[in-house]
Amino acid sequence: MSITNEQILDAVAEMSVMQVVELIEAMEEKFGVTAAAAVVAGGAAGGEAAAEQTEFDVILESAGGNKVAVIKAVRGATGLGLKEAKALVDGAPAPLKEGVDKAEADALKAQLEEAGATVAVK
């Protein structure tokens, strides 16, 4: 008489955690295997994480040659007052907007670069 998979599963379900650990160790020893989980390659996981990025930070790297136009662009993009926008531009590199979607980040970058600023999207 052979034991079915269902009978084995029922027997394991009735065991305590310690008994299951002992069973696994005995199986590893008897069959010369290990019960280690498969490890995902680090490179593949990193590539997927980069592809799944949905929030971006827009960083003002420098104001460039036309500081006044950049301050106006910063005011329009952020809704800051003149004093705050000037302080942000003077303090470059500085985060301009954080946690925005890809389309907004790209549009903001294009707008600021058109005004003469150097911008990074991270």
UniProtKB/Swiss-Prot annotation:
- What task does this protein carry out? Forms part of the ribosomal stalk which helps the ribosome interact with GTP-bound translation factors. Is thus essential for accurate translation.
Protein's recorded name: Large ribosomal subunit protein bL12
Q: Name one GO molecular function term.
A: mRNA binding
Q: Which GO terms describe its biological process?
A: translation
SUPFAM superfamilies assigned to the protein according to its UniProt record, in alphabetical order? ClpS-like, Ribosomal protein L7/12, oligomerisation (N-terminal) domain
The record's note on quaternary structure and interaction partners says: Homodimer. Part of the ribosomal stalk of the 50S ribosomal subunit. Forms a multimeric L10(L12)X complex, where L10 forms an elongated spine to which 2 to 4 L12 dimers bind in a sequential fashion. Binds GTP-bound translation factors.
Q: Which family does it belong to?
A: Belongs to the bacterial ribosomal protein bL12 family.
InterPro entries the UniProt entry points to = Ribosomal_bL12, Ribosomal_bL12_C, Ribosomal_bL12_C/ClpS-like, Ribosomal_bL12_oligo, Ribosomal_bL12_oligo_N_sf
Record keywords, A-Z: Ribonucleoprotein, Ribosomal protein
Q: Give the Pfam families listed for this entry.
A: Ribosomal_L12, Ribosomal_L12_N
GO cellular component, alphabetical, reads: cytosolic large ribosomal subunit
Keyword Ribosomal protein carried by entry? yes
